[in-house]
Amino acid sequence: MADESAFRNFSLLIPKVVIEKHVETWLKEDTPSFDYGGFVVGSSVEKAVLLCKSDGVLAGVPFFNAIFEKLDCKVEWQNNEGDPIKAVSVIGTVTGPVNKILLGERVALNCISRASGIATKSRSLTNLKEQYQWHGEIAGTRKTTPGFRVVEKYALEVGGVSTHRYDLSTMIMLKDNHIWSTGNITRAVKNARRVGGFSMKIEVECRSLEEALEAAHAGAEIVMLDNFEPQALHTTAKTLKGKCAGVIIEASGGINDSSIAQYFGPHVDVISLGCLTQGYKPVNFSLKI
């Protein structure tokens, strides 16, 4: 039987080789040739204190660790991934050659600052969902930063929300442009099923009850009700569930942390928000030697 503590060890989500590939890219981006600052400070062994300077949820520890591991430094933490953290507090230390600490400083801080910001916003919406006793799932989207998606999707997990599909190859989502290019929903779903087979879920973006029913009857497992006002959403979702009980209903489009509670309802299974990875406030950290 799996150790219960493993379900809190978020680092197990990401293979080491994946993290190392990203770390190498980030470090080369920040220092593509000479390290002038490193020449100035030398290579004596020093200890830097990691300070949290704004409240939030800690996320991004595996990336922070991997950056300094690559630079022959040792990181020690006083908090665990997913913990609430307060300003101003010491949450860890980095020990190693001072030039290498400074070489990794900004890259590492960028990672945990952004990851923690996403996790903090995600956690606040998870708490709101529990407050309203809504039993559906809050999810992110593919509205992520090119080259940084693995960190952002990981941070959603730490914050307690669903990542949604990771990329175009993870699930087939047929949006308005797919439908218009194909001619109709039924044909688009049929074409998708032919290549996706039994193991690939199909989701269709719909703008009306009629489109939603067509998508469900064509075999889509998930129907996205896009840009619906809350009352229209709940009415449409109830009717759709009454006719197609097994379909998963997702609400999306224009939903944010201020309006999300209006979309909680017994017939809505998923609410997805782009603002989780686009409209968050990074948590402020600094390293002090």
Swiss-Prot record:
Q: Which reaction does it catalyse?
A: nicotinate beta-D-ribonucleotide + CO2 + diphosphate = quinolinate + 5-phospho-alpha-D-ribose 1-diphosphate + 2 H(+)
Stated EC number for the protein is: 2.4.2.19
Identify the residues that bind quinolinate. Answer: 106, 142-143, 164-165, 175, 205, 226, 252-254, 274
User: Per the record, what is one GO cellular component?
Assistant: cytoplasm
Which UniProt key words apply to this protein? Glycosyltransferase, Pyridine nucleotide biosynthesis, Transferase
Q: What class of enzyme is it?
A: transferase
Pathway-wise, it operates in:
Cofactor biosynthesis; NAD(+) biosynthesis; nicotinate D-ribonucleotide from quinolinate: step 1/1
Where is region (Important for hexamer formation) located? 12-16
Q: Which InterPro entries match?
A: Aldolase_TIM, NadC, NadC/ModD, Nicotinate_pribotase-like_C, Quinolinate_PRibosylTase_N_sf, Quinolinate_PRibosylTrfase_C, Quinolinate_PRibosylTrfase_N
Where are the bilayer-spanning segments?
Answer: none
Record GO biological process: NAD biosynthetic process; quinolinate catabolic process
Instruction: Please name the GO terms that the record assigns under molecular function.
Output: nicotinate-nucleotide diphosphorylase (carboxylating) activity
Could you tell me which Pfam families the record lists for this protein? QRPTase_C, QRPTase_N
Q: What is annotated about its quaternary structure and interactions?
A: Hexamer formed by 3 homodimers.
Q: Briefly state the protein's biological role.
A: Involved in the catabolism of quinolinic acid (QA).
Q: Which family does it belong to?
A: Belongs to the NadC/ModD family.
Protein's name according to its UniProt entry:
Nicotinate-nucleotide pyrophosphorylase [carboxylating]
Organism from which the protein derives: Nematostella vectensis
Q: What is the lineage of its organism?
A: Eukaryota, Metazoa, Cnidaria, Anthozoa, Hexacorallia
